[in-house]
Amino acid sequence: MPHSDELDAGDVLAVENLNIAFMQEQQKIAAVRNLSFSLQRGETLAIVGESGSGKSVTALALMRLLEQAGGLVQCDKMLLQRRSREVIELSEQSAAQMRHVRGADMAMIFQEPMTSLNPVFTVGEQIAESIRLHQNASREEAMVEAKRMLDQVRIPEAQTILSRYPHQLSGGMRQRVMIAMALSCRPAVLIADEPTTALDVTIQAQILQLIKVLQKEMSMGVIFITHDMGVVAEIADRVLVMYQGEAVETGSVEQIFHAPQHPYTRALLAAVPQLGAMKGLDYPRRFPLISLEHPAKQEPPIEQKTVVDGEPVLRVRNLVTRFPLRSGLLNRVTREVHAVEKVSFDLWPGETLSLVGESGSGKSTTGRALLRLVESQGGEIIFNGQRIDTLSPGKLQALRRDIQFIFQDPYASLDPRQTIGDSILEPLRVHGLLPGKEAAARVAWLLERVGLLPEHAWRYPHEFSGGQRQRICIARALALNPKVIIADEAVSALDVSIRGQIINLLLDLQRDFGIAYLFISHDMAVVERISHRVAVMYLGQIVEIGPRRAVFENPQHPYTRKLLAAVPVAEPSRQRPQRVLLSDDLPSNIHLRGEEVAAVSLQCVGPGHYVAQPQSEYAFMRR
């Protein structure tokens, strides 16, 4: 039934008194309470808040996707103006009617494109399916339109990408495919749920710019769900702040940033890591934590020196890691991915060395190669005077007691069939270190050390939040008293308060136990906060390395400056240079088998500060 007289002029969406609840052990648990908002055509509304505040379930309720998950949705009004300008009440639509609304009139970009795209269908088939369903196009017409959409989201070689599967694309490319699919039918409303959270800063900047360009072209209303206040400042017209299922403040982006009224909004803004906030400070600094009772305040810097003088605990020289690519009728290796090329660095006890760079720069492969989780083709890895790269499997297992790994996705790295107590105990059992009672006491101590309760040992991973699962992974990494921890994007997908808690925990553990961290991240503001030294990687090579202050306050390499310039700043009035939408993620690091890449030559430009020389820099950046 039409409701055209109930929408205010210019509005494309209006929600009044939305309530969402879930049944848990025969109890109704409220997720969202009395939420009301509107969205105008061509406007971007940012919905912000921490994990569990109700942002994503609100989006799913608008898309009518909560019913299958057992959600209980009640709303006085949920009106949408379709592309045809007809106004409908979403809550009154049948499942069959909603199939025609989703995609055509209201589309959604999900946070994780790998789980949102079907792995058994090509990219072209998935985009074309939506076009055929909503536009009554033939298969040939749908594929032509799918290619046009890939061109529109600046994907290079779109015709080739149409025939590829999701796993064959990078994270940034998959996210752009999701955007192309969502926009393929020119919807009236686009809901973007954390579309850039786990992406590196340059790809994030491209996607934000892309959404703004396409929004202007299509006069779309956009609901942008995020916990990143820098992104909010860059893209939003209005902001809705949610806390524990309720809207606590709403207003223009300038009002929210310059005159926040609610204590939670003020605490949220104060807790945002600001690039440049560490200027003039030599040592890492703890994050302020969010609290309604005590608004976030700056923690003092860690003044004591944690780095121990003497020999480095880890020494890497000319590390080379390549992956074969097979092709042809005989499936021979014809090309190789040069993931890591002649990388060298030292890591001292009590030091945090951060590896930064875009997706595909070789950061994670470097970390995995140090533990021989991937095999390297050259170079030396020396831990406490002993070469890791030549050890037998038995001796390597013993050495892994001293080097532990924290993975990006804690849920994927915990066995869902094991209690977390068993997961933490497993390294102790493998190395035969502690008998039963002592091991149980050790687990209880570790859980308390990472801010959890000893009785949590009997629970399973799915019973914890993302931040709690990451704490469990840290507890497991600490079980063997390691000397080195490799943290691979350990906080990239966590919201600002949980991220602050985890970083503070890592700093406390470093102070107490002298642990050295190799911190792999694309979040430059976090890297600035936690690091003693920083190494910048590009196409598998280190192009700049030095003390954190030198790299951040006086970056010498153009790629380092590019990374820093791409970081969103939580200041909406700041004038930003117009970005050029790049046509690809990174130049290719795929070469013919046997082809050697010129090693970058580093030049000293300050105490401990080394930068790629211009001539060698050109040799690899031109590819």
UniProtKB/Swiss-Prot annotation:
Cellular-component GO terms for this entry: plasma membrane
UniProt family annotation: Belongs to the ABC transporter superfamily. Glutathione importer (TC 3.A.1.5.11) family.
Enzyme class: translocase
Reaction catalysis annotation: glutathione(out) + ATP + H2O = glutathione(in) + ADP + phosphate + H(+)
MF terms (GO), sorted A to Z: ATP binding; ATP hydrolysis activity
Ranges where the ABC transporter domain occurs: 15-269, 314-564
Subunit relationships: The complex is composed of two ATP-binding proteins (GsiA), two transmembrane proteins (GsiC and GsiD) and a solute-binding protein (GsiB).
Top-level lineage group: Bacteria
Protein known as: Glutathione import ATP-binding protein GsiA
Residues holding ATP: 49-56, 357-364
Listed EC numbers: 7.4.2.10
Gene this protein is translated from: gsiA
Reported function: Part of the ABC transporter complex GsiABCD involved in glutathione import. Responsible for energy coupling to the transport system.
UniProt KW Membrane keyword: yes
Protein's organism: Escherichia coli O6:K15:H31 (strain 536 / UPEC)
